[in-house]
Amino acid sequence: MSYKENLIPSSCSSSSSSSSKFATPSSATAAQRVLRKQPYVSIFTTPSDNLLAQRAQLAPRVTPAASSSVPGRVALGTDVASHNTALAEAPKRKFTIDDFDIGRPLGKGKFGNVYLAREKQNKFIMALKVLFKSQLEKEGVEHQLRREIEIQSHLRHPNILRMYNYFHDRKRIYLMLEFAPRGELYKELQKHGRFDEQRSATFMEELADALQYCHERKVIHRDIKPENLLMGYKGELKIADFGWSVHAPSLRRRTMCGTLDYLPPEMIEGKTHDEKVDLWCAGVLCYEFLVGMPPFDSPSHSETHRRIVNVDLKFPPFLSEGSKDLISKLLRYHPAQRLPLKGVMEHPWVKANSRRVLPPVYQSSHPK
């Protein structure tokens, strides 16, 4: 979940039978790429007063990743790692908005705002996302928020934004998130136009490692794109929006979610899909990193659809053979033919160009 609120109505739904108002909208609409980008505002304000808190338990402690022996890759310092794990070490307690000093807004969206915040008792710095229940109910996207909390709060990976905790009152829901000091990757891409091979390969290795971690836990993201990525203290990539994600034990879904430019053929054609949709998205993302725009970008939705299902892939002349090889192996019509995430991390172009800050932490089995 990025700092810009990115929950939008869709035909996506979970099969929950909850008796609350958390209902799914009945009208199905084609997913579109909607950018909600606003500049930071350097004011000091508090979003609320007189609030009632719900008991919320803090997540278990996270151990910082060990140093990597791979040349050119440096482990994150313990000072930064401790910043990211400090909340997990605090005693269990109740939270209210009065427990926080609220700083400048980090982002604004349709359903609320995100603020830089400091927990008063232990001086923890974080991003506090404040969402209005009335707006969530009005748009029928409460199920997405519930799903996002359920998924993101259990993920522990250096390239996935931490959700430490959450609490709520009568009108608002508050998400306690890891603060990503370097901000939004989308803005960085806009600023530079496109990234060089070293930065693109580094991001691809980090993304592949994080997605492999998710897939091992049967979590499909389904909406990887620059708008849903942030950058940490060392500029490392962090997946930050799980609004369209699903925890699917069967790893097979049929709803069409995500962003038009990034939708794979099987989702456009309404076929059953699995975790390999994220492989397609990774290929689109790599292309956009290097070129500055998605590979199937067209004036109309129908033309974009046509180009995607036909895999009408065109490379500009300045791309290297290695990068084109990686992208071509990810953007395959048949999901089973797409390069696995391990293959992305071991691809010669990635290994030759990546300057990753954090070592891989993917494990082949669940932690006990």
Curated annotation (Swiss-Prot):
Q: What is this protein called?
A: Aurora kinase B-B
List the gene name. aurkb-b
Species name for this entry? Xenopus laevis (African clawed frog)
Q: Which SUPFAM superfamilies match?
A: Protein kinase-like (PK-like) (SSF56112)
CDD domains for this protein: STKc_Aurora-B_like
**Annotated catalytic residues:** D223
Query: Subunit info?
Result: Component of the chromosomal passenger complex (CPC).
Q: Which Gene3D superfamilies does the record cross-reference, listed alphabetically?
A: Phosphorylase Kinase, domain 1, Transferase(Phosphotransferase) domain 1
Q: Where is the Protein kinase domain?
A: 100-350
